[in-house]
Amino acid sequence: MDSVKTPPPRLIAGDFEHAMLRIPSRSIGMVLTDPPYGIAYKTGMRKDRHHRFCREIEGDRDLSALERAAPEMMRVLMPDSAACVFMAQETLAQAERIMRSAGFEVVNRIVWDKGAHTMGDLTHAFGKRYEVLLYCAKGRPRIRGRRWPDVWRFPRVPQNRLQHQNEKPVELLERAVESLSDPGDMVLDPFMGSGSTGEACARCGRAFMGCEIDPYYYGVAEARLMG
């Protein structure tokens, strides 16, 4: 972990659009985010409708949230910096079009290999074992440290430790942060969920700014990062 002293995380409750309008242009060192995938995701593992994971993710009916966020990502990012966006297989092509329309170059489709496939439709489809992290460039970012291949193998967060139904392992996020930003840089997550990106930034010596519209998950992130 880097020894650079960073300011406390800046957490914003509410819609990312209002928050990002207040961010100065060319002030963010990296965007790393896991936006709504546009697949109306609900976990099939939960039978109790009152369980915290038995809820639709805000804005997950389509990719309109990413469509609104992408131009603002381009505006607030410093020259020669990266936006890394997680996306589902089903909506990957559409997400790439959105990022390109905002002015980004899609450099890599980084495959996150979870090590075990999901259940899903047992008679019609093969088990899904990966998600994609789109590495998108504003200008020409440089890769710091090791040049990793484009398949990253990290196990999923164990079910008994999940704080969000689509939570990403912090170690996976650390690799992205360390590879595409410098110590002390401000990393932005417009859809921070339970705050995993913020934890990765704290471990890596990066400043963090995150937005979350869902009051429940904002509270989870606040307790995780500010507690």
List PLM regions with ranges.
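Core catalytic lobe of class I
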Residues: 1-219
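Class I S-adenosyl-L-methionine-dependent methyltransferase module
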Residues: 90, 226-227
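Short functional hotspots where side chains directly engage DNA or cofactors
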Residues: 220-224
